């Protein structure tokens, strides 16, 4: 028994010793010193203070960008060009807070071994206080996952990650404004389009487009905005000098698809698009040269006038009406909104769901096509007031063969409507009902 107790004591003592050893050799994480220092930063600059960038590539042309008085970047060398503001900002974001992957040498006497005596890339930045910084990029690391860099005047050699090198290694084509039309879309007040053997002119009043030519017509603003988006998004595709000559030749011999003009208070810009075989080519009044254009741009010019016309009978859209009046033969419906509630002509509070259903049916009224004649004595008229009753719209509707023709008050345009839309409107009007009485 005594011998067994002795054995137990030895086991307990060994366990306590092991626990003490583990405790002394496994300190809490927060007290364990870092195994290595964080790699040092190479550059820490305020991006907003940088007003000039110089990029030199070994064996290539030097590219210089500078901020103008409005704070926008411009290419000033090798020739004056607009700059892609987003691309320049992205590059500066990487450069102004450039981290190293590691510090290779604190002080070296042989930059040549890293390719830094004759760097493949040099990026110089000038701040508004005239202070300059020159980053030199040398050879790739042996594993090709980074590159050697240094700052001019600094004896240290660092490595940076390959993705950082990619974000800094930019050409003229990467940084220039590649838009074929450089006007800002929200400033454009007029669009002229010559395409499909037709000339169409659009004018914008606030956020609404109207057709001005060939005659004043209501425009589908969504369709005009889509045309404008294609024009302002059109970008050049750069290639070699040989490709440029082929592109110019293809444009010259191609068939004209469209000429589009965009106008703002500051002037007008023009884009001509031609098609040669299956490809589109574009020439701009503000950019030298001829460029291949995307199919998205080229195919956007094949719409007819009617494609840009507003087929909706009413303009109130998704604004809530304030007042609705419908006459359908001997039937009449009067609805007025007060606060959040709808009221009938005889002062009864109406069921909101049935009124919203009727409003939806009025919104749904749109033309299947436009007609030149056929309107006769109307059997239905619908009047809608909206925008705090500042907008009043009235439409007259007459039976026409198996469908209906509608005409907005004081406008000559005739809209052919599917008979199912009118039937849905009539049924929804019949289904109007007073609000349920609240239980006391």
Residue ranges and their predicted role:
Residues 1-440:
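A short-motif feature that recognizes glycine-rich, charge-decorated loops
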